[in-house]
Amino acid sequence: MSTARPCAGLRAAVAAGMGLSDGPAGSSRGCRLLRPPAPAPALPGARLLRLPESEAVEAASPERSGWTEALRAAVAELRAGAVVAVPTDTLYGLACSASCSAALSCVYRLKGRSEAKPLAVCLGRVADVYRYCQVRVPRELLEDLFPGPVTLVMERSEELNKDLNPFTPLVGIRIPDHAFMLDLAQMFGGPLALTSANLSSQASSLSVEEFQDLWPHLSLVIDGGPIGDSESPECRLGSTVVDLSVPGKFGIIRSGCALENTTAILQGKYGLLPSQGSCS
């Protein structure tokens, strides 16, 4: 495991930033994927591992070895209570074990983020949602939206760490449409807390180079290449966040990058009604 101290304090000027952004190279819907650039220079602190392109990863290929190495390294760091930077289907994110209270506190300190703002929970399978949430929608609805660039907010179960978002009975669930993140969540075997890899109030990150200020304070950075076109504002919107905690209704908490498709499924296929005050 890396000897980096992921919970070391940021410089005072860095720690002052406060704000909200959604956490998290793979299939990015609506954004053009670019070829990965040359590897970024390593900074003191974080270990950087470059992912092979997912299309090249086959059972006995050299690329599979690199993919497996990155998975094992990330799981080891997460189980040790560290914070790891990861690519998702929307943005680069910071992940930690949702069951490790010290790691959760570390994420807030790293980002300069108010602890009144919740972290999402990343899972690897739709079946896992039922363990951590009180689900009041058909399973088919979950399967239509997951994996994908959405965060579904539901009532949390007693299985989740009480130090995770203790101020709310709800939790946002992510199952990213990204091969590495699906493998990581399944191999880790528990809930991952996930947020965007940026200082609060700053722009979200589409490449590892865009959050280099955080590298020295992380144990591991997984470089999956650019997620989308850095010149496109749409590619920085993050996931579409939907409240499904009220039976028969949905509320759009954040429009995100998949609003049109998400609302079409919720209303057109399942007949859910927009809740009062929804930004849809």
UniProtKB/Swiss-Prot annotation:
Main localization (coarse): cytoplasm
A GO molecular-function annotation: tRNA binding
Membrane topology: Peripheral membrane protein
Localization in the cell: Cytoplasm; Mitochondrion; Cell membrane
One Gene Ontology term from the biological process aspect of the record: negative regulation of transport
Modified residue annotations for Phosphoserine: 61
Broad EC category: transferase
Start and end residues of each YrdC-like domain: 68-258
The EC number(s) this enzyme carries: 2.7.7.87
Record keywords: Cell membrane, Cytoplasm, Membrane, Mitochondrion, Phosphoprotein, Transferase, Transit peptide
Transit peptide residues according to the UniProt entry: 1-56
Cellular component, GO, one term: plasma membrane
InterPro entries assigned: DHBP_synth_RibB-like_a/b_dom, Sua5-like_dom, TC-AMP_synthase_SUA5
Superkingdom to which the source organism belongs: Eukaryota
One Pfam family matching this protein: Sua5_yciO_yrdC
Known catalytic reactions: L-threonine + hydrogencarbonate + ATP = L-threonylcarbamoyladenylate + diphosphate + H2O
Subunit structure: Interacts with RSC1A1.
Family that this chain belongs to: Belongs to the SUA5 family.
Domains as described in the record: The mitochondrial targeting sequence (MTS) is weak and only mediates import of a small fraction of YRDC in mitochondria.
Function statement: Cytoplasmic and mitochondrial threonylcarbamoyl-AMP synthase required for the formation of a threonylcarbamoyl group on adenosine at position 37 (t(6)A37) in tRNAs that read codons beginning with adenine. Catalyzes the conversion of L-threonine, HCO(3)(-)/CO(2) and ATP to give threonylcarbamoyl-AMP (TC-AMP) as the acyladenylate intermediate, with the release of diphosphate. Participates in t(6)A37 formation in cytoplasmic and mitochondrial tRNAs. May regulate the activity of some transporters.
Protein name per its UniProtKB record: Threonylcarbamoyl-AMP synthase
Source organism: Rattus norvegicus
